[in-house]
Protein backbone atom coordinates (compact mmCIF):
# COMPACT_ATOMS: atom_id res chain seq x y z
CA UNK A 1 0.00 0.00 0.00
CA UNK A 2 1.22 3.49 -0.85
CA UNK A 3 2.59 5.64 1.96
CA UNK A 4 0.32 8.54 2.95
CA UNK A 5 1.24 11.90 4.44
CA UNK A 6 -0.90 14.86 5.44
CA UNK A 7 -0.81 18.29 3.86
CA UNK A 8 -2.36 21.05 5.97
CA UNK A 9 -2.97 24.35 4.20
CA UNK A 10 -4.64 27.03 6.29
CA UNK A 11 -7.50 25.18 8.01
CA UNK A 12 -7.77 22.33 5.47
CA UNK A 13 -6.05 18.95 5.77
CA UNK A 14 -5.57 16.73 2.71
CA UNK A 15 -4.09 13.27 2.25
CA UNK A 16 -1.26 12.76 -0.23
CA UNK A 17 -0.05 9.39 -1.45
CA UNK A 18 3.66 9.19 -2.18
CA UNK A 19 4.70 7.75 -5.54
CA UNK A 20 7.64 5.86 -4.04
CA UNK A 21 7.84 3.48 -7.00
CA UNK A 22 8.32 6.39 -9.44
CA UNK A 23 10.23 8.94 -7.33
CA UNK A 24 11.89 6.95 -4.53
CA UNK A 25 14.68 9.42 -3.68
CA UNK A 26 12.38 12.43 -3.50
CA UNK A 27 9.87 10.55 -1.33
CA UNK A 28 12.65 9.34 0.96
CA UNK A 29 14.04 12.85 1.41
CA UNK A 30 10.59 14.23 2.17
CA UNK A 31 9.93 11.54 4.78
CA UNK A 32 13.33 12.14 6.42
CA UNK A 33 12.48 15.83 6.91
CA UNK A 34 8.95 15.47 8.31
CA UNK A 35 7.32 17.33 9.87
CA UNK A 36 7.79 20.38 7.64
CA UNK A 37 6.33 23.80 8.41
CA UNK A 38 6.40 26.47 5.74
CA UNK A 39 4.37 29.19 4.05
CA UNK A 40 2.27 28.96 0.89
CA UNK A 41 3.32 31.20 -2.00
CA UNK A 42 0.78 31.37 -4.84
CA UNK A 43 2.13 30.96 -8.38
CA UNK A 44 -0.28 33.45 -9.96
CA UNK A 45 1.76 33.62 -13.15
CA UNK A 46 1.40 29.85 -13.67
CA UNK A 47 -2.26 29.39 -12.81
CA UNK A 48 -3.87 27.14 -10.18
CA UNK A 49 -0.65 26.25 -8.37
CA UNK A 50 0.94 27.16 -5.10
CA UNK A 51 4.47 26.59 -3.91
CA UNK A 52 5.95 25.61 -0.57
CA UNK A 53 9.67 25.90 0.28
CA UNK A 54 11.04 22.55 1.50
CA UNK A 55 14.36 21.78 3.26
CA UNK A 56 15.79 19.28 0.76
CA UNK A 57 17.06 18.76 -2.78
CA UNK A 58 16.62 15.70 -4.97
CA UNK A 59 17.67 14.83 -8.51
CA UNK A 60 14.96 14.76 -11.19
CA UNK A 61 12.79 11.64 -11.13
CA UNK A 62 9.47 10.89 -12.83
CA UNK A 63 9.57 14.14 -14.85
CA UNK A 64 6.19 15.68 -15.61
CA UNK A 65 5.38 18.71 -17.76
CA UNK A 66 1.57 18.56 -17.88
CA UNK A 67 0.10 18.81 -14.40
CA UNK A 68 -3.27 17.36 -13.41
CA UNK A 69 -5.22 18.58 -10.41
CA UNK A 70 -3.87 17.02 -7.25
CA UNK A 71 -0.32 16.56 -8.54
CA UNK A 72 2.47 17.40 -6.11
CA UNK A 73 5.91 18.00 -7.62
CA UNK A 74 9.38 19.07 -6.57
CA UNK A 75 11.11 21.86 -8.48
CA UNK A 76 14.59 20.98 -7.31
CA UNK A 77 16.63 24.05 -8.26
CA UNK A 78 14.45 26.26 -6.04
CA UNK A 79 13.77 23.71 -3.24
CA UNK A 80 10.07 24.21 -3.93
CA UNK A 81 7.19 21.77 -3.64
CA UNK A 82 4.52 22.66 -6.21
CA UNK A 83 0.89 21.78 -5.48
CA UNK A 84 -1.47 21.86 -8.47
CA UNK A 85 -5.05 22.31 -7.32
CA UNK A 86 -6.41 22.36 -10.89
CA UNK A 87 -4.88 21.26 -14.21
CA UNK A 88 -2.02 23.24 -15.74
CA UNK A 89 -1.39 22.48 -19.43
CA UNK A 90 2.35 22.94 -19.78
CA UNK A 91 5.44 24.00 -17.89
CA UNK A 92 9.05 22.98 -17.41
CA UNK A 93 9.61 19.48 -16.08
CA UNK A 94 9.53 18.81 -12.36
CA UNK A 95 9.55 15.64 -10.25
CA UNK A 96 6.04 14.26 -9.78
CA UNK A 97 6.30 12.51 -6.40
CA UNK A 98 2.84 12.62 -4.79
CA UNK A 99 -0.87 12.90 -5.51
CA UNK A 100 -3.61 14.44 -3.36
CA UNK A 101 -6.25 11.76 -2.85
CA UNK A 102 -8.26 13.11 0.06
CA UNK A 103 -9.88 16.55 0.45
CA UNK A 104 -8.67 18.03 -2.84
CA UNK A 105 -11.73 20.31 -2.59
CA UNK A 106 -10.37 21.86 0.62
CA UNK A 107 -6.95 22.43 -0.95
CA UNK A 108 -8.63 24.03 -3.97
CA UNK A 109 -10.54 26.34 -1.62
CA UNK A 110 -7.34 27.36 0.20
CA UNK A 111 -5.49 27.81 -3.12
CA UNK A 112 -8.19 30.12 -4.49
CA UNK A 113 -8.27 32.01 -1.20
CA UNK A 114 -4.48 32.48 -1.34
CA UNK A 115 -4.80 33.76 -4.93
CA UNK A 116 -6.87 36.66 -3.60
CA UNK A 117 -5.55 37.16 -0.08
CA UNK A 118 -1.93 36.00 -0.06
CA UNK A 119 -0.12 33.16 1.70
CA UNK A 120 -1.21 30.65 4.32
CA UNK A 121 0.66 28.43 6.77
CA UNK A 122 1.48 24.92 5.51
CA UNK A 123 2.38 21.75 7.39
CA UNK A 124 3.39 18.37 5.98
CA UNK A 125 3.39 15.47 8.43
CA UNK A 126 2.70 11.76 8.88
Give residue spans per PLM region.
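A short, compositionally biased
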Residues: 1-4, 68
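Glycine-centered tight beta-turn/hairpin loop motif at sheet-sheet or coil-to-beta transitions
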Residues: 9-13, 78
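Glycine-rich active-site loops that engage anionic ligands at enzyme catalytic sites
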Residues: 18-126
